[in-house]
Regions:
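WD40-repeat beta-propellers
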Residues: 38-42, 93-97, 146-150, 199-203, ...
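Conserved loop/turn motif of beta-propeller repeat scaffolds
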Residues: 26, 74, 79-81, 129-134, ...
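A short helix->beta-strand "capping" segment at the edge of beta-propeller domains
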Residues: 1-16, 52-53, 165
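Conserved strand-to-loop turn within each blade of WD40 beta-propeller repeats
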Residues: 32-35, 87-90, 140-143, 193-196, ...
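Short loop/turn segments that connect beta-strands within beta-propeller blades
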Residues: 44-46, 98-101, 152-154, 204-207, ...
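Canonical WD40 repeat/beta-propeller blade segments in eukaryotic WD-repeat proteins
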Residues: 16-23, 62-75, 116-128, 174-183, ...
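Blade-level signature of beta-propeller repeat domains, shared across WD40, Kelch, NHL, RCC1
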Residues: 351-389
Length: 389
């Protein structure tokens, strides 16, 4: 079995500096960059529309922005929420409200004074499908704690006053360690990944840890660590995918969440002499993982300039996209070298996300899923699965 993805559109030099974050909501593909801007790229493009002519840009902070997550929901009474949370290199956590009719992005002040004193790193929204469970916002700080807020929505005429973030509590790391990533499952579990290679899974209601997973790749030395780059729960919350370093390689490990047992690793053949004692998903660090809407497939991306799609049940690779600077459609937007003169002919991939059916415009988007990725050549690429049109 294999899956074929074809390019639908792309944009080179999408930002003036490296693109570090990617998030897909129904209206927009959202990116953030070291240039200090977040950009909201319209998803439903008509034939002939160019992405750069259909983007909303918002300057956040001069130090740059490294994490971003978008939230879109239609609440009871038809109240539509479109929020973007991002974290700057100064450690500030910022939330914006998007007015889709006016194409305006405005900052909303939802944090208490104690919230603002923290220095944050990763941010993640959780969209609840249960009316009894509030939407949540998660954010890790540089000391390893994960703060959890409940998002409440009241029905008022003033769009800003109807939103409230109420601190639910904080998950404190057993030892101080940099918390690199976080996610929440619909089964009420929160996963936090750490620089030392561990992942702590906690209950969202009590904030108490229930599992502690360790990396299963080759143990890194002090010079080549085992940092966890990303954690993602499957849509039903039954699985947890963990991407971590193993020296200069990238590992992806799957765990089931009911009993906290390791299922196995996603593996491709490698020419490394250490292959017999390690299981590698990429020949470079894995920066991001993304489940599709059914949880059947997992997309991964890495420093090896590749995006891979895997069958989760069989743990088999179904597709590999090898990215090249020449993929970019507009020649003057191709970036062949970085500011240090290093080649970007085959750019590392910093982020990847599945795109649900019906989100993107164009032929086949209503019947086929897609992919979106961001690369070190400051580009954004969109794909859709071939066939079924």
């Amino acid at each position: 079995m294999s899956k074929l993805f074809i390019s639908t559109t792309n944009v080179g030099r999408a930002h003036e500096a490296d693109i570090f974050g990617l998030s897909i909501s129904t209206p927009y593909t959202v990116t953030c960059s070291g240039d200090g801007w977040i950009k909201l790229w319209k998803n439903r493009l008509l034939e002939g529309d160019l992405p750069k002519n259909n983007v909303i840009s918002k300057f956040v902070h001069r130090t740059g922005v490294h994490h971003v997550d978008a939230f879109h929901s239609v609440e009871h009474g038809g109240v539509e929420l479109d929020l973007v949370a991002c974290v700057t290199f100064s450690g500030e956590l910022v939330i914006y409200s998007v007015n889709m009719k006016q194409l305006a992005v405005e900052q909303v002040d939802l944090f208490s004074s104690s919230d603002k004193q923290k220095s944050y790193w990763c941010v993640k929204w959780f969209k609840s499908s249960d009316s009894e469970i509030p939407h949540k916002l998660l954010a890790t700080d540089v000391k390893g704690s994960t703060r959890v807020w409940n998002l409440t929505v009241s029905h008022t005429e003033d769009a800003d006053s109807r939103l409230q973030l109420i601190l639910h509590g904080e998950i404190t790391a057993p030892v101080a360690n940099f918390a690199t990533s976080c996610d929440m499952s619909p089964k009420g579990l929160i996963a936090t990944g750490f620089e030392n290679g561990s992942v702590i899974v906690s209950q969202a209601d009590t904030l108490r840890p229930v599992y502690n997973f360790e990396g299963f790749g080759i143990r890194g030395t002090e010079e080549s660590g085992r940092t966890v780059r990303d954690v993602k729960f499957s849509p039903m919350g039954e699985l947890l995918a963990v991407a971590n370093d193993s020296g200069s390689y990238g590992c992806v490990t799957l765990y089931e969440t009911e009993y906290g047992e390791r299922i196995g690793n996603l593996t491709v053949p490698t020419h490394s002499s250490q292959a017999s004692i390690g299981s590698f998903a990429h020949n470079g660090w894995v920066f991001a993982v993304s489940f599709n809407s059914t949880g059947e497939f997992l997309a991964t991306c890495g420093y090896d300039s590749k995006v891979r799609v895997w069958d989760v049940k069989m743990r088999e690779r179904l597709s590999t996209l090898s990215l090249s600077a020449g993929d970019i459609e507009i020649e003057e937007d191709i970036l062949l070298e970085d500011e240090f003169g290093d080649s970007l002919k085959n750019p590392p991939v910093f982020g990847v996300s599945f795109v649900e059916k019906g989100v993107r415009g164009g032929t086949g988007s209503d019947t086929n899923e897609g992919l979106c990725c961001i690369c070190l050549d400051r580009s954004i690429r969109w794909y859709r699965e071939a066939g079924g049109i």
